[in-house]
Swiss-Prot record:
Ranges for region Disordered: 23-80, 94-117, 139-171, 341-377, 717-885, 892-911, 931-967, 1061-1186, 1202-1294, 1308-1570
InterPro entries given in the database record: AGC-kinase_C, Kinase-like_dom_sf, MAST, MAST_pre-PK_dom, MAST_pre-PK_dom_sf, PDZ, PDZ_6, PDZ_sf
One Pfam short name: Pkinase
GO CC annotation terms, alphabetical: axon; cytoplasm; cytoskeleton; dendrite; membrane; neuron projection; neuronal cell body; plasma membrane
GO molecular function terms noted in the UniProt entry: ATP binding; magnesium ion binding; microtubule binding; protein serine kinase activity; protein serine/threonine kinase activity
Low complexity compositional bias, start-end: 105-114, 151-170, 864-878, 933-961, 1104-1132, 1149-1174, 1519-1535
GO biological process: brain development; cytoskeleton organization; intracellular signal transduction; protein phosphorylation
Name of the protein: Microtubule-associated serine/threonine-protein kinase 1
Gene: Mast1
UniProt keyword annotation of Cell membrane present: yes
Family: Belongs to the protein kinase superfamily. AGC Ser/Thr protein kinase family.
Catalytic activity: L-seryl-[protein] + ATP = O-phospho-L-seryl-[protein] + ADP + H(+); L-threonyl-[protein] + ATP = O-phospho-L-threonyl-[protein] + ADP + H(+)
Length: 1570
């Protein structure tokens, strides 16, 4: 073959080969397709030996180069990059091939090798020159092998630019000479390159030019500058190799290809020019280095492999030379496989104009009017955030839903965050990955920057965690793996998320994960290939040196906290925290403040669950590897493949994740359902502020560049447009959407909404930054966190935020709900409103994993408890596994309660969302306390409808059984003093588990009474009272809620058969039953304190039933306080079951007594059910829980366990709830009972921490009166233990139980007022106030002390007792006139006025005090006849809120029967003095029934009454009731009491009106009777 021919074959392009053994140039670069192959013969048919590559060209393998000696003339060393990346450095897209001199023709430049320049040879080298060069390269000696690096992804072997023809002579000397030439020239070329790169980066960096309007191009622009900077850095560090240049070129080509394929903007021309300039800058050093590192031997092998591939693949129809010529394009045929970019360049890399025009054409052809706000109709708010809000919008033309994120410009400008908004836009626009939320368009309005994103319906993982607790391992593995793939994609493009957390992991309608919220992300250097150069891991770990601490504290990596510089490993740290949270249910590190949390992150060891809760070994190893403090050794620092290869994913099919069926699939009531999201309106009010202010005229110019439209939007728009033409257009009212551009906006909006909907609107909002609102999340008061921070203070994460007060969550819908409440409720017969119906369904759907059906099943399992059987379980119920249900139940108890509260509010007057934004489930408190099916609860129509966010309604959030149809609220106008119905608490077990939630049913409706007239039906399940969900509320809370509503109460019910609750035989192991956690979570603080000492897991998984560790205690308090609302307001009632209540219910708070409670969130809520619940000990289930609860609280990391009230479920219900609305001044905390109930609940005395009185919210006068009376009784009974009441911290466990019983805070007002315990003298019988669930039954007249003889004043409760109990240090003045009962009054001192049920000091006779009768007292008086007479109908109690500070007293006949009244009688028998230390009252509740028809106090004797079975709660009607000892007014069900056999639905916490209270603390046998 002639040398001339081989020279002509300088452009040798190898086909791509499967093994990746050969590099293939990207099509965008024509030169990349060229291989420089200098052949010495023009005739392909000449003898092969003359060809440089005899083996390749020859047909026989024997001819391959390896069979030739290096000196063989036929042996030609092709410069091949040692790796498969060997390729020559003529860049097709560049105007010149490398030296900066233009090739004579761009065509030649692109089609021919630029070897001439590389070797500094004439444009047309002579044959002699080529021969000389051939000699130089004839030797097989390989130049230093730089092959250490990995091969570039596209293997494209190519000859080196200097591939001279072969000559028989030896060229070792010439090679040495040429290498010397290159080495000599390379430093100069390198220095020139570095200077040009520096100028290039400075001139074109994003900060120095206006941001590109197109998000994709803006991202690419950023990456090009990053690549230039990286090249400059590596050049200075001496790390540049040929392989590096290959990868750099590949990255640039990939970016350019993305620009052409994904952008329709004319700005592509700008990006193209940037790429060309950069390639020109690096071309000369690249070629010189390529020559220096050329390894002929390797190139031979590559060519041989290529030839073999061509033959095997039948790609070669002719002989090899012709094939090569054709492949090189020397036939001048167009390259079919070349990217159009080259064609557009039309043979000239120097003619970018063509690219521009073609690009322009494509963009213009698709050009539509830019998207604008007017193109979208705003449907509803999805969520609020620190910077703005996310709305569900619908494109007016296509009718497609999107999520529109609206960021307030002013906020961005004030915080200097404008650039970050562009970063988020660019990342979302550029990202194209199934696990990353996509953006469709962006635009600006006068007040906002809007991003339209895809709408992800299922809410976020944080909410899911709140609702169901720890995830099953398989579910956690799938979610984690999908997030790993999303992270791998982002890291490949240099994106560091910096705010990874469950809140930013959205769940799609198919149950898969999408990562969102890039508001805090950083764009670094893309790395599409694996870096093997020395020190790259260290460099990647220190990529950013801004020393900025941002993110969500619980997920911030140690290197960020220490301001050591950070990089991609920070995301892997967050992934470790997330996996731990998925599997354990809470984050591993907690703190009340960011500083405390950071201290733990840096120095503390991880606490691992043990025993049954222990994590799989591989999962624990994976978490430990991810949570390495040193980023250099952290798993993932070397790339995502390190994580993917871990044994935890041994059996995972990484390529088939999207094909796997998800365990949890959100269920949406409609396409506009956003119930899985928390609006967080209580925290942010962007909605109201949006268009009110004028924008600043001096806004930065770059903001005008924010509008963009992604190609995906154009595709969606065009396809949807066609569909939309056939659909009726029903524009949704656009709220705040000005009509701008319809087409582009929709999809992006959807995406934005989706992202925002997840945890919070924006990352920024969720993330913590100094100075920004996020920091508030860390504020000591959890309340702020509760209010809606996506990430609450460290320990108080959103998840834990479930503790948040319901009122906060309900706030957004409060008005709506309240309005509904105000409306006369529809008759119970009415089908539930569609909203209500939807809610249950959503709830079920929302919690795909936990099936409502299961909870339903549990509910059904207690048929005896529930009066009417529920017809069917939720069909979805079966979905969740029993284990998952149980875990969820646990989790929900904490978070679920909150959720329940949220939902009901919607129905009632407030949206009762999960207490924490995180808690997805909204429970229907009335219907299914916790025991119901959590999953089903979402089904409850109200819960779903009530919550704006589907989370609340999602089944996982709710324990309430699925309720297929809720009726409109039934408004019962009290006639006289009674409502005319009796309600009863039932336990609803979840599946076959021992976890139950408390639901309430209408047990009896009095004929001709107000309830019957209003349409209330016996057997209906009560879901909401005054718009507040009662699912999960203990009986006293519900009663309190009803009584505090005044003359009118709005009750929402659903036919039992419409629920998923099934009635079954009584549980024999009911003593093992555990009440499902309410959705309140324990404050993070408490959890934190115990964190080290107690098993974190126990807290989370087991105790989670009572509290969640995630949020700080402060949040609990806040929630309580927030839940406190005006006594009459539905919200006020809400607190009872609200998470706040749960908090109150904390055993500790119970111990603390009223005062402690006051300080506790529970106390803040005056009549919160929780407080009432605290008084009563639940049936045996609660018992069992009580010890656990105590331990859990202690173990919790929270600083002060006392601060965390038990969840309402944990508390025994107290009738107080039933009591009339507390006076405005009354606070939940004020009632002792409220606090005390937790103490009783626990079998072991809880640790009592006194709370400052100052912390106590004002109490309602009624509760105060009741409590003060209770205190009196306690002080009178001080002989037991120095008059320490449950309130006092020192109370012994038994006493504590007794006290618990004695506390009236949760009793109905009638009970509280009438139940002042008699003073115990040596011969005095202790009077036991019996309360009925439905009615206030107390042996005492409200105004009189039945046990005190006339004229005898009751001693004041000892101040010690008060203070110890936390009730009050000061003793309020009392009226102590003979004949009148001594009542404590508020005298400037907030103290809980509770009747003291404990034995008073011995020897003190009690006199009946007669005074003006309060409504409750009148009731008591009316129902009391002469002592010993039982059955005198009580005077109906008129429930009227008493004015604060005003006490009504009424004379009350005294019951002298020391053993207790067989019938509730007005008289309270004197109790014989009993040793305080030993005596404790066990409230046996056969069933909790509250008769709202005629409330009358039923005295209970401390001793076992002859008929302990007598249910105190018997309806006013003549419901058979055995005589039972009166229960001390405040007494709740004591742990150990047995629930009524056969009543599955009876709520253990509802021992509110247990029929039998035994002094010994053991359930009286009779009481256990039905």
């Amino acid at each position: 073959m002639s040398d001339s021919l081989w020279t002509a074959l300088s452009n040798f392009s190898m086909p791509s080969f499967p093994g990746g053994s050969m590099f293939r140039r990207t099509k965008s670069c024509r030169t990349s397709n060229r291989k420089s192959l200098i052949l010495t013969s023009t005739s392909p048919t000449l003898p092969r030996p003359h060809s440089p590559l005899p083996g390749h060209l020859g047909s026989s393998p024997l001819d391959s180069p390896r069979n030739f000696s290096p000196n063989t003339p036929a042996h030609f060393s092709f410069a091949s990059s040692r790796r498969a990346d060997g390729r020559r450095w003529s860049l097709a897209s560049l105007p010149s091939s490398g030296y900066g001199t233009n090739t004579p023709s761009s065509t030649v430049s692109s089609s021919c090798s630029s070897q001439e320049r590389l070797h500094q040879l004439p444009y047309q080298p002579t044959v002699d020159e080529l021969h000389f060069l051939s000699k130089h390269f004839g030797s097989t000696e390989s130049i230093t092998d730089e092959d250490g690096g990995r091969r570039s992804p596209a293997v494209r072997p190519r000859s080196r630019s200097l591939s001279p023809g072969r000559s028989p002579s030896s060229y070792d000397n010439e090679i040495v000479m040429m290498n010397h030439v290159y080495k000599e020239r390379f430093p100069k070329a390198t220095a020139q390159m570095e200077e040009k790169l520096r100028d290039f980066a400075r001139a074109y960096e994003p900060d120095s030019v206006l941001p590109l309007a197109d998000g994709v191009l803006s991202f690419i622009h950023h990456q090009i500058i990053e690549l230039a900077r990286d090249c400059l850095t590596k050049s200075r560090d001496g790390l540049i190799t040929t392989v590096y240049f290959y990868e750099l070129q590949e990255n640039l080509e990939k970016l350019l290809q993305d620009a052409y394929e994904r952008s329709e903007s004319l700005e592509v021309a700008f990006v193209t020019q940037l790429v060309k300039k950069l390639l020109i800058i690096i071309s000369r050093p690249a070629r010189l280095l390529e020559c220096l590192e050329f390894n002929p031997e390797e190139f031979y092998h590559l060519l041989e492999a290529a030839e073999g591939h061509a033959k095997e693949g039948h790609l070669v129809k002719t002989d090899i030379p012709r094939y090569i010529i054709r492949q090189l394009g020397l036939t001048r045929d167009p390259f079919p496989d070349v990217v159009r970019l080259e064609e557009q360049d039309s043979g000239g890399s120097n003619t970018p104009e063509q690219d521009d025009t073609s690009e322009g054409r494509s963009s213009t052809s698709k050009a539509k009017k830019p998207p604008g706000e007017s193109d979208f109709d705003t449907i509803k708010l999805i969520s609020n955030g620190a910077y703005g809000a996310v709305y569900l919008v619908r494109h007016r033309d296509t009718r497609q839903r999107f999520a529109m994120k609206k960021i307030n410009k002013q906020n961005l400008i004030l915080r200097n965050q404008i650039q970050q908004a562009f970063v988020e836009r660019d990342i979302l626009t550029f990202a194209e990955n199934p696990f990353v939320v996509g953006m469709f368009c962006s635009f600006e309005t006068r007040r906002h920057l809007c991003m339209v994103m895809e709408y992800v319906e299922g809410g976020d993982c944080a909410t899911l965690l709140k609702n169901i607790g720890a995830l099953p391992v398989e579910m956690a593995r799938m979610y984690f793996a999908e997030t790993v793939l999303a992270l791998e994609y982002l890291h490949n493009y240099g994106i560091v998320h910096r705010d990874l957390k469950p809140d930013n992991l959205l769940i799609t309608s198919m149950g898969h994960i999408k990562l969102t919220d890039f508001g805090l992300s950083k764009m670094g250097l893309m790395s599409l290939t694996t870096n093997l150069y020395e020190g790259h891991i260290e460099k990647d770990a220190r990529e950013f040196l801004d020393k900025q601490v941002c993110g969500t504290p619980e997920y911030i990596a140690p290197e960020v906290i220490l301001r050591q510089g950070y990089g991609k490993p920070v995301d892997w740290w967050a992934m470790g925290i997330i996996l731990y949270e998925f599997l354990v249910g809470c984050v591993p590190f907690f703190g009340d403040t960011p500083e405390e949390l950071f201290g733990q992150v840096i120095s503390d060891d991880i606490l691992w669950p043990e025993g049954d809760e222990a994590l799989p070994t591989d999962a624990q190893l994976l978490i430990s590897s991810l949570l390495q403090t040193n980023p250099l050794v952290r798993l993932g620092a070397g790339g995502a493949f390190e994580v993917k290869q871990h044994s935890f994913f041994r059996d995972l099919d990484w390529t088939g994740l999207l094909r796997q069926k998800a365990e949890f699939i959100p269920h949406l009531e409609s396409e506009d359902d956003t119930s899985y999201f928390d609006t967080r309106s209580d925290r942010y009010h962007h909605v109201n502020s949006y268009d009110e202010d004028d924008t600043t005229e001096e806004e930065p110019v770059e903001i005008r560049q924010f509008s963009s439209c992604s190609p995906r939007f154009s595709k969606v728009y065009s396809s949807m447009e066609q569909l939309s033409q056939h659909e009726p257009k029903t524009p949704v009212s656009a709220s705040g959407a000005s009509k701008r551009d319809p087409s582009a906006k929709g999809p992006e909006e959807k995406v934005a909404g989706k992202r925002e909907g997840l945890g919070g609107l924006t990352l920024r909002e969720k993330t913590w930054r100094g100075g920004s609102p996020e920091i508030k999340r860390f504020s000591a008061s959890e309340a702020s966190f509760l209010e809606g921070e996506a990430s609450p203070p460290l320990g108080a994460r959103r998840r834990f935020s479930a503790l948040l007060e319901p009122s906060r969550f309900t706030a957004p819908q409060e008005d709506e709900d309240e309005a509904r409440l105000r409306r006369p409720p529809r008759p119970s017969s009415d089908p539930p409103s569609s909203l209500d119906t939807r809610v249950p369904k959503e709830a079920v759907q929302g919690e795909g994993t936990s099936t409502p059906g299961e909870p339903e099943a549990t509910e059904r399992s207690h048929p005896g408890d529930l009066g009417p059987p529920s017809k069917d379980g939720d069909p979805s119920g079966p979905r969740a596994t029993n284990d998952l249900v149980l875990r969820r139940a646990r989790h929900q108890q904490l978070s679920g309660d909150l959720a329940v509260e949220k939902r009901p509010s919607r129905t009632g007057g407030k949206v009762i969302k999960s207490a924490s934004a995180t808690a997805l489930s909204v429970m229907i408190p009335a219907v299914d306390p916790h025991g119901g099916s959590p999953l089903a609860s979402p089904m409850s129509p109200r819960s779903l409808s009530s919550n704006p966010s589907s989370r609340d309604s999602s089944p996982s959030r709710d324990y309430s059984p699925a309720v297929s149809g809720l009726r409109s609220p039934i408004t019962i106008q009290r006639s006289g003093k009674k409502y005319g119905f009796t309600l009863r608490a039932i336990r609803v077990y979840m599946g076959d588990s021992d976890v139950y939630s408390v639901h309430h049913i209408v047990w009896h409706v009095e004929e001709g009474g107000p309830a019957q007239e209003a349409g209330l039906c016996a057997g209906d399940l009560i879901t909401h009272v005054n718009g507040e969900p009662v699912h999960g509320m203990v009986h006293p809370e519900v009663v309190e809620l009803i009584l505090k509503s005044g003359n009118k109460v709005a009750v929402t019910t659903t036919p039992f058969e419409n629920t998923s609750i099934r009635i079954g035989p009584a549980r024999r192991s009911s003593y093992k039953a555990k009440m499902a956690r309410r959705n309140k979570r324990p404050s993070a603080k408490d959890g934190q304190e115990s964190k080290k000492r107690s098993s974190l897991f126990r807290k989370i998984t087991k105790q989670s039933n009572l509290l969640h560790t995630s949020r700080s205690l402060s949040s609990l308090n806040r929630s309580l306080s927030s839940s406190d609302s005006l006594p009459g307001s539905p919200t006020h009632g809400l607190p009872a079951r609200s998470p706040t209540h749960s908090y109150r219910s904390t055993p500790d708070s119970a111990y603390l007594g009223a005062s402690s409670q006051s300080s506790s969130p529970a106390s803040s809520t005056p009549n919160s059910p929780a407080s009432s619940a605290s008084h009563h000990i639940r049936p045996s289930t609660l018992h069992g829980l009580s010890p656990k609860l105590h331990r859990q609280y202690r173990s919790a990391r929270c600083k002060s366990a006392g601060n965390i009230p038990l969840s309402p479920l944990a508390h025994t219900p107290s009738p107080t709830q039933a009591s009339p609305p507390p006076l405005p001044g009354h606070t939940v905390g004020s009632s002792h009972t409220t606090q005390s109930f937790p103490a009783k609940l626990h079998s072991s005395p809880p640790v009592v921490r006194p709370r400052p009185k100052s912390a106590e919210p004002p109490r309602s006068p009624l509760l105060k009166r009741v409590q003060s009376a209770e205190k009196l009784g306690a002080s009178l009974g001080a002989d037991k233990k120095g008059a320490l009441r449950k309130h006092s911290l020192e109370v012994g466990h038994p006493d504590f139980r007794k006290d618990f019983h004695g506390e009236l805070a949760l009793h109905s007002l009638a009970e509280s007022d009438g139940e002042t315990p008699p003073i115990e003298g040596p011969g005095a019988t202790r009077q036991v106030a019996v309360r009925r669930l439905g009615r206030q039954e107390s042996p005492l007249s409200l105004g009189a002390d039945p046990l005190l003889p006339d004229g005898v004043q009751r001693p004041m409760a000892s101040s010690k007792e008060d203070s110890a109990g936390g009730t009050e240090a000061c003793t309020p003045p009392r009226a102590t006139t003979p004949g009148s009962r001594t009542l404590e009054r508020d005298s400037g001192c907030t103290r809980h006025q509770s009747v003291q049920t404990e034995d008073g000091p011995g020897g003190v006779a009690r006199a009946l005090a007669k005074a003006a009768l309060s409504p409750v007292q009148e009731h008591e008086t009316g129902r009391r006849s002469s002592s010993g007479e039982a059955g005198t109908p009580p005077v109906p109690i008129v429930v009227e809120p008493a004015r604060p500070g005003v006490k009504t007293q009424a004379p009350q006949p005294l019951g002298t029967d020391s053993k207790g009244l067989k019938e509730p009688v007005a008289q309270m028998p004197l109790m014989p003095d009993a040793p305080r230390g030993r005596e404790r009252w066990v409230l046996e509740e056969v069933e909790e029934r509250t008769t709202l028809s005629g409330l009358r106090s039923k005295p209970a004797s401390p001793k076992l009454s002859p008929d302990p079975q007598t249910p105190t709660l018997v309806p006013t009607k003549n419901v058979p009731r055995s005589a039972a000892p009166s229960v001390p007014p405040a007494s709740l069900m004591v742990p150990g009491t047995k629930p009524e056999a056969g009543l599955n639905s009876r709520c253990p916490a509802e021992a509110v009106t247990p029929a039998g209270l035994t002094k010994t603390g053991a359930p009286s046998p009779a009481s256990l009777g039905p």
